[in-house]
Amino acid sequence: YLPRNQLESKYANEIHCKEIAILPYYIANLNIEYTYKQKTGKYKEFENICLVDTLDNVGFSKNYDNQMDIFWLSDENAERIDKQNSKKISVIIGNPPYNANQLNENENNKNRTYPAIDDRIKETYIKQSTAQKTKLYDMYARFLRWSSDRISENGIIAFVSNNSFIEARSYDGFRKVVADEFSDIYIV
């Protein structure tokens, strides 16, 4: 519950959104703006949504080199990315894309590399693992690693995820690292 008199400040300064695909970007933006209008009775543009690949945007500074060369990566979007990167984040909620183990090249859903995140996975989850190492470069592990590195102290991470990390041998290092990095873990 958030009192109405605090909503404007939260909306303008504390709620942020990232999306890599253009249609979900617009849908998220519309949903956020519509909810704000429903709660307050007035429309206000939501200025804290960015069109960006979260996993390419590491180091929390300008890094657009690996972003797709697309017409909508405007100066305004770049400014929004910089603004988000400078913010202290205490809650991250996400639904990482799933594209591990595609059946063939024609699925057009390749697992691309993310050097900065993949290095962090190697330094943490893989370093602590006794299992096959390549499975830890899936999108779930990447987003969890990014979130763990990005979150502020006393922060919360909530993801929609499969359950492979609970018992799979390939996630033994992940489980060790997460147990060390977090004081509480809830799996629903």
Each model region followed by its residue ranges:
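SAM-dependent methyltransferase catalytic region
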Residues: 1-187
